């Protein structure tokens, strides 16, 4: 496969941007080799600047659930562009998307739009403290909630890929109020509440982990967190930036029947444009300025283009049979991956929910981030390169979930599984 133009562009990029990228995982540091530079995307496919085509299982890290550049989304954006790219003022599109989110997500009675998942999580943390009058929070090892200082403690894929426990430049005083527990460990959470009476503002987690690889909640875990937070007067926050509208139309909370107090969202709700949101019970959300005293603002928040793409994407997802189709596609993919690895005698464990999937190159089960670290990252790097040579674009990290879309066809899945069979045989 010729990648000479990608190599030249990335070489130039390293003189212009730190590491040559705008987000660390894109640099391929954990899988080796140089990154592929994309030229365009359409449906389930991405083309690089050298003309190579790939079946894409990243989907812009989650937003492209309907497929890249869906014609109805593009048409809606073209119409919206004629009216301007940014208003900096209220627009009716915000109302429309807000109503759709409130209708879909069980916990959300009011919503505030922002520009990224990080911004949503930063804002919801401030809101947790404002509402409860408490400073501490509990997060889980391997759960990623953006790159805000207080969340960069045992934060999963980003820092794991770099081999860093957290990040230089984060003051110890900032993280001293961040308490961590292993995912799927209710007893550890009980101990933290016992050790910090009336001090914990809330518990935040990815209800389905996608940034420590793909890890699912054990039966009773989410329910147990709901009971504990109520018992201690703390808030339960689901970070559904990744799982929202991806594992079901109402996200993980609808799928598992556990309703948090607050929810953060992003990715899918922007239809591929920069967006984030946080929402929850009205009595909590009314703390947010200008309705209440907790300040949060943004120049591009509620951007009309992002709202337009989000509205059209959710309209497409709401069509009958959408999630059954996504689930079927993803199950066929992950089952085929597991079979291919086992045929090559490569240790593997994996799973899928909705349009998310993941696997670890180790014996299972994987219940938490500590278990995930047993994955054979070196072998995964070899597998990633082998798949890339066969035209399959996987996340360039052993600690990231994968994503399917409505655009992935049966032929795409079969082509992908053929590549996995060959690649597992090559790295066995």
Curated annotation (Swiss-Prot):
Q: Does the keyword ATP-binding apply?
A: no
Give the GO molecular function terms. glutamate-1-semialdehyde 2,1-aminomutase activity; pyridoxal phosphate binding; transaminase activity
Q: Where does it live in the cell?
A: Cytoplasm
- For this entry, the protein name equals Glutamate-1-semialdehyde 2,1-aminomutase
Q: Which CDD domains match?
A: OAT_like
Lineage, top-rank taxon, reads Bacteria
What pathway is this protein a component of? Porphyrin-containing compound metabolism; protoporphyrin-IX biosynthesis; 5-aminolevulinate from L-glutamyl-tRNA(Glu): step 2/2; Porphyrin-containing compound metabolism; chlorophyll biosynthesis
Q: Record's Pfam families?
A: Aminotran_3
The main place the protein resides is cytoplasm
List residues, modification N6-(pyridoxal phosphate)lysine: 267
Assembly, in brief, is: Homodimer.
Give the family from UniProt. Answer: Belongs to the class-III pyridoxal-phosphate-dependent aminotransferase family. HemL subfamily.
A single GO CC term for this protein reads:
cytoplasm
Entry keyword Cytoplasm: yes
Q: Which GO terms describe its biological process?
A: chlorophyll biosynthetic process; protoporphyrinogen IX biosynthetic process
The EC class name is isomerase
Q: Which UniProt keywords apply?
A: Chlorophyll biosynthesis, Cytoplasm, Isomerase, Porphyrin biosynthesis, Pyridoxal phosphate
């Amino acid at each position: 496969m010729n990648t000479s133009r990608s190599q030249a562009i990335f070489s130039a990029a390293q003189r212009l941007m730190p590491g040559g990228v705008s987000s660390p995982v894109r640099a391929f540091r954990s899988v080796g080799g140089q990154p592929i530079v994309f030229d365009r995307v359409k449906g389930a496919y991405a083309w690089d600047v050298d003309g190579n085509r790939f079946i894409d299982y990243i989907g812009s890290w989650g937003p492209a659930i309907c497929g890249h550049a869906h014609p109805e989304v593009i048409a809606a954006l073209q119409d919206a562009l004629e009216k301007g790219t940014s208003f900096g003022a209220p627009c009716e599109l915000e109302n429309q998307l807000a109503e759709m989110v409130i209708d879909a997500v069980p916990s959300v009675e009011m919503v505030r739009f922002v520009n990224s998942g990080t911004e949503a999580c930063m804002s919801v943390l401030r809101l947790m403290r404002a509402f409860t009058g408490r400073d501490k929070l509990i997060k889980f090892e391997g759960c990623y909630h953006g790159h805000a200082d207080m969340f960069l403690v045992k934060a999963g894929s980003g820092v794991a890929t770099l081999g860093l426990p957290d990040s230089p430049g984060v003051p110890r005083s900032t993280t001293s109020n961040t308490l961590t527990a292993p995912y799927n460990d209710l007893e550890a959470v009980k101990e933290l509440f016992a050790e910090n009476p009336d001090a914990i503002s809330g518990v935040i987690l990815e209800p389905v982990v996608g940034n420590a690889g793909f890890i699912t909640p054990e039966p009773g875990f989410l329910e147990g967190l709901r009971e504990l937070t109520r018992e201690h007067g703390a808030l339960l926050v689901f970070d559904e930036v990744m799982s929202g509208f991806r594992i079901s139309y109402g996200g993980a909370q609808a799928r598992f029947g556990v309703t948090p107090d607050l929810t953060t969202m992003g990715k899918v709700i922007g239809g591929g444009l920069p967006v984030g949101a946080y929402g929850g019970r009205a009595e909590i959300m009314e703390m947010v300025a200008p309705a209440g005293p907790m300040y949060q603002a943004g120049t591009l928040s509620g951007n009309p283009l992002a709202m337009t793409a989000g509205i059209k994407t959710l309209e497409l997802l709401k069509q009958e049979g959408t999630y059954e189709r996504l689930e079927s596609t993803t199950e066929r993919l992950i089952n085929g991956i597991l079979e291919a690895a086992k045929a090559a005698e490569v240790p593997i464990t994996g799973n899928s929910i909705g349009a998310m999937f993941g696997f670890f190159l180790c014996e299972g089960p994987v219940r938490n981030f500590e278990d995930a670290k047993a994955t054979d990252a070196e072998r995964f790097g070899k597998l990633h390169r082998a798949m890339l040579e066969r035209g399959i674009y996987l996340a360039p990290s052993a600690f990231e979930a994968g994503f399917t879309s409505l655009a992935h066809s049966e032929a795409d899945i079969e082509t992908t599984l053929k590549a996995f069979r060959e690649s597992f045989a090559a790295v066995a």
